[in-house]
Structure formats: C-alpha cells, structure tokens
C-alpha cells in the first residue's frame, strides 16, 4: 500500500518474518513514517493548466489503474470560491483531479497546494460476509496459520483490534491463485527467496495487491521471485494463477500470506513513529469456501482443501465471463 505527500511517500506496511516455531507464523507490521523520494518515484504525478477563461485544471497521471484517495490542502487560494481542503477519489491511469473557476473572470486564480494520497477508496461499502476462495487451485491441501502483528512484538505499538492475516502452507511449491475477482494494481518482484535459519524478521518479500470492485484490497505476500504470471492492470478471477509460493526458512513449508483491507482513515500524521502509529486501514476477517464447508472462518493450524464452487463465480462475474469460465 502506498501513502504519499507531494513528492514524499510512506510505505503502508512492511512484511516481517518470524522464525519461532516449526510451522512459522509470519508477521506484518504497519510502517507509516514518511520517506523522501524523487518525483520519478512518485506513484502519482500532478499537473495544472490555465484555460482561456482563466479556470485552472488540475490533472493526474499514475502508474496503475487502482483507486487512491487524494487530499489537497491549498496554502494560497485567491479569486475562486473553491474549498481550501479537498478530498478526492481517483482511479484509472489519468484524469481530471479538480477544476478551479475564477470569481472574477478578468483575473487569474492564485493558488499553491500540497497533495497527499493513499491507496484505496475511503470507507468503501463492503460485504463482511463475502465468500472468498483459498489462494490455491481446487484440490490443493493447505495448512493455515494466523500471522501475528510484528509491531506489537518488536516495536512496542499495539496490535490493531481487527488485525487478521492468514498464511497458507503447502508441502511442495505450488501455484497461488486469486481469491476473488479484481484488478491487479501493484506487483513487487524484487527479492530472491533466500532460505535462512535464525532470521527474526525481514521486509524482503515479493508482493501483489489486487483491488476488488467494492474497494477492498487483497495483499498477497511471499511469491517466488520471477514467478508472477499476471500484470498490473489485468483483471483476475477466482482461481486465476498469480505466481508461485515460496519458502522462507528451512523450518517452514512453501507458503503465501493473504491480508484483506480497506481504507478507514485519512488522518495522516507525519509525526507518527513506529511506536505510536495507528493503521489507516481496517482489516477484514474473511469467510472462505473450502471443499469441506461452503462458508467458514478459518482456524489457525488446521488443514483445508481448496475448492472453487460455481456460486463464487456467480457472485461477481458477468454472463460473458461465466461462459468463458464454463460456469452454468
């Protein structure tokens, strides 16, 4: 997830690896510190144009089609009745952000602003009982473990009340699949999968974010480097192959983690530290369809067999998409 302010950004969370028990429970943390980056690294670029009627158009271009919440704070704003604070939802690769219209058409508009943005639609309406599939092909058996919150263990801040992240283990390397229809909005494929003993935690993982139609986000972490078979901007469906899971240390099985979130706050505080940070995202406890049960909340350290029933496809797919996937 990404949070940026003008030409500076804050990572949403960093993946941590805890090697404590045989079936390793891998943990996540939320990192909300602001980091300075160059304009070339910015996920969204803003531009402005003054029209012949003295109106000003603010536009955006970005690197993925996903939804962002943009916060504009005008330091200077003259000859227009626009609000000095604007919260705007954007999606797609480019578009109009805001148009400022002059009060006096014979004069130009004076303005300067700071922009902050974070991935996701603010407070989306979602179904808490939505049924997801396991992140593997039908018939694959997976051991489930709940991941702890590494911040509470290592950095002193408290675990979010709604914290829920699952890790799915397989005995052999296997294909990771989408748990729901959505659009791929981010892929990080940077790190070799080095199997090491005695590692307390690491932020080095290969990740993917998929945005769903209701504004929720699925973050998959722990892919084998170079194994991704989908691209940013691609629509995926339940069971669509995404890449391969990986092994984190010699004591763990091959695995992938899954976290379902939504943007619940836009109260961004640059003074936050690891110790006092609070998540801007809410966490969803998902319901899953498995071979054993059509609607179940998973229990840690239990095995489940993956299944993709037709009802899962019928929930979101169009008639054309269902026909393509052989769903009647």
Regions found by a protein language model. Name each.
Residues 63-81:
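Short acidic, flexible loop segments centered on an aromatic residue
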Residues 193-198, 245-258:
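Active-site loop architecture of trypsin-fold serine endopeptidases
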Residues 176, 182-185, 233-245:
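A structural signal for short beta-strand/turn segments enriched in small hydrophobics and glycine
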